[in-house]
Amino acid sequence: MKLARFVLLSVVFAFAFTNVPSAFAQLGTAGLSGSVVDSNNSSVPNARVVVKNKATGQTRETTTTEYGVYTFQNLPPAVYEIRVEMQGFATAVVDNVTLNVGQVPSVNITLQPKGTTETVTIAAGEVVGVDTSTSQVSGQINERTLASLPLNGRNFLDLAYLLPGNAPAPNYDPTKTTTLEISSAGQLGRGGNIAVDGADNNDDVVGGTLQNFPQDGISEFQIATNRFSAEIGRSASSAINVVTKSGSNDFHGGGGFYYRNSRLSALPATLNRTLVSTIGRPPFDREQYTASFGGPIRREKAWFFSAFEYRNQDGVVLVGVRDFNARRVVTSFAPAPLNDLLFTGRADWQTTSDDRMAFRYSLQREDDIDRGSLRRPIGTADNRQHSFNRYHSFVYNWTHTFSSRLLNEFVFHENKFLNQIPTFVENRNEIRFPSVQDGGNFRIPQRTRQNRLQFRDNLSWTTGNHAMKFGFEFQRLDTDAIFDLFGSGTIFTTEDFATRNRDTNPTINDNDIPIALIIRSVAPNRPPTVPNVDNNFYAFYVQDDWKVRPNFTLNLGVRYEFDTNTKNVKNFGDIFSIVRPFLRGTRNSDKNNFSPRVGFNWDPWNDGRTSIHGGYGIYYDRIVLEVALLERLLDGRALPLEVRTGSVLDANGNFVPGTPTLANPFVGTIIPGAGAVGINIIDNNMGTPYVQQYNFGFQREVFRDYILAADYIHAFGSSFIIGRGIGSVFNPVINGTDSVVNLESSVKNWYDGLLVNFQKRFSHNYSFTMSYTLAKSFNFSNDDQIPFQVGPLDNNRLRLEKGPPPNEERHRFTFAGTFDLPYGFEFAPIYTLASAVPFDIQLPPDLGGTRIPQIQRNAAARTFKTGAELNAFINQYNTGRPTAQRLPLVLDSLDLGDIFTSFDFRLSKKFNFGERFAIQGIGEIFNLFNVTNIRGVNNVNYSGFQNTLIRDNENPANPGFLRSSSFGTPLQTAGGVFGTGGPRAFQIAVRVVF
């Protein structure tokens, strides 16, 4: 591996400095390249090429090379006019050329001899082809698509699922319910790099997306699924490149109101209809308010744009209520409101003809109430949690043009994130009755704080046939956390209601319920705090896009990345002495993360309409800081727990004097060693996860504005993190034995995918994009970095963990379009069809509750498609085993897994009042045919099905002992605050635009 890296690195540098253009677009920008020829198809060198931003009037110019080739880098995404001038030829003007973020379209222009006509105007569709300069696999969501397609919850990233190679990912952070996670090229979604205006927007604590933005403030975004340039790092899967809107020379803006409620929505298929008939439909309403305004501060000099969005959602969660009269737990609804405020403001300033500056400030304030972490079938209203999330980000961008071939971009960025989950009810112990979880939740209070400072600088230099880029990046992350666990104490009871009087009080009440045991933090008045989980990130890169011939480009680059403290190097001396014998060698930061990247793009007919491309690259993921938090929280001291004995009864079934009761619970005897939660250590040799990416594909404009693309992608990941048990020690803090878990980078993953896209650019009143993905992937864990849920079955045979990831969709098809109809109507549909995701098959609780060791991880919907197929295995498994060790059979007719399908659409009507003012009425339907789509939320059970072989009866003599009628029953439907596929829902809206 190291030899291969060395050879590739040497090749890259040899190519890069052989001759000192095509162009890779930078983060948050676009590029443009092409050739200029005469009517005899001969190259025209030294022609003057000027591009003009039609919204702001800004211009850039260059001259063609000796081969007649021109290149522009670092252009703001916008609609441009291209003007080509050369003595002896008529001036050629190409109008309305749209440059999207991350794209480098090829625009080849033929000059005509000067005659009676001084200027020849060319339609953009006649000359704008496909990207013949880069080898990346990517797609764009443009401003028109963003504004027209129906979005449940109005999160713009929802549209990333329309592009091939991308699919929904599990939500890793239940405290951020208003974010979406994206799985690209088989990865699980913690990684990926999301940049907004070139600034990092990643959650470095748990992974995934950080801040959300008003949809009306987003201009467009690109998602590069594979093989992006050396400028972009910190991602082993995809890079999402988002651009916010900027002002123009004309004032423009609008406002809107979106509304839906329970009467406009169908009921979830998993909701008990008896409950609905008893207490009514679950109440729900959502109002969203939007506003935007932008325009010139000084025409052709300075501009501004701002956008605001507020969501007020009043929903409910199912809760349990202990009915003392009926002596049973009944189900009811408890309020679960969500309030989310989004704002972004931007100013652009052309200070001189060579200097352009941009400033952006964005804010998000989100509060929500939801159910807490449950270990019982249902929780009470007191067991909910209240999350507060605050986000602030500021970006400064300065672009200086030294000459037509040399420019520099500098970015400064600061963002602050604070999540708090305070105590929901004061002075309440959590009580886990057999059927319901009551009192203050065992996992709160919590707090996470992340502050980031980021500096990026990129120098772009076009010389000869080379488009060179050099750059560096620095990020400083300061993080701290408070994580309470059983701080208020959790009491486990044996009964939901007292069955008799057991104390001296003649009244039968809760104080007569026996206690099984009690868990409480050793230091309940001091929630564990982890300060100074900080990290410095450095990156340097060189990129050379070398146009070897006018129709053949080599993309050559190398990137170096270095994190100082993702392995807790700074706090290594604080590790508990009892586990130091398990640490091998010395701990140092991973310093050899070189990422060579090489690719090609060939336009065989040199007409800008065809691209045959491919390449190879190494891409390093970022290690989330929760890995370091695990070592510091689960260190054997920070989260010490005590387990106390429960109630003691005399021969008559009464409490003995002084025994623990709900009136005085914390008087039982501490059980030595029972409070062990495990000690996590980071392996001294842990490295940064990385993926080797290969791709080969083509793109062809088959007819004007119709583009077909197909790419094969192979990705092989190494050094991904897993937690492996390596022994145990005596822990004096708990006075007992504690297990030791080694956090190590010792597992791999694989992905093979065919990505097909057919799209039509907007013309003749319609556009569409159609995508299909055929993919297969494997990994070693349902989480690629945080080994916090379920460890490997055999710590010495990790290959037994190889299986499909929990969100793998073998087939995924999407269609979306916008169609302008007569009389001001617009129709915009989205259709999604995806195959079933796999899930684990868990042993009955009496046999341990882990997955069945003899089958692969996530075997349901892969190895076994039906209940009959699973039963054939179970019958074979049970042969020769005693009844107590046999597995129960499931229903033969059961289909394992659920195909996902949903059809959403928007129908709108615009009423124009003059040339600049309009009112738009909107109706939206999500999941028109009300198809039941079963999907979960997190990676513990993403399928949404009950996946444990729970016996119908616990008595081995009862036939129900060998039946599991509940296995495979739906637990949760898709959809929620964001996304599609949930119960059918109607939404109405009205917008004002000017």
Task: Explain the meaning of each model-derived region.
Residues P660-T669, G824-E915, Q920, N947-A974:
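Extracytoplasmic gating/loop element in the C-terminal half of outer-membrane beta-barrel translocons
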Residues A90-S246, S265, N272-T278, P282, ...:
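Periplasmic N-terminal accessory/gating domains of Gram-negative outer-membrane beta-barrel systems
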Residues A709-P838:
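Gram-negative outer-membrane beta-barrel transporters
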Residues K2-L9, F13-N142, D200, P214-D216:
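Periplasm-facing N-terminal accessory domains of Gram-negative outer-membrane beta-barrel systems
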Residues H252, R281-D367, H386-E414, P596:
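Transmembrane beta-barrel wall of Gram-negative outer-membrane proteins
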Residues N933-F994:
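C-terminal beta-signal and terminal closure region of outer-membrane beta-barrel proteins
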Residues F156, A169-N171, V569-S595, G599-N742, ...:
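Solvent-exposed loop/turn elements at secondary-structure boundaries
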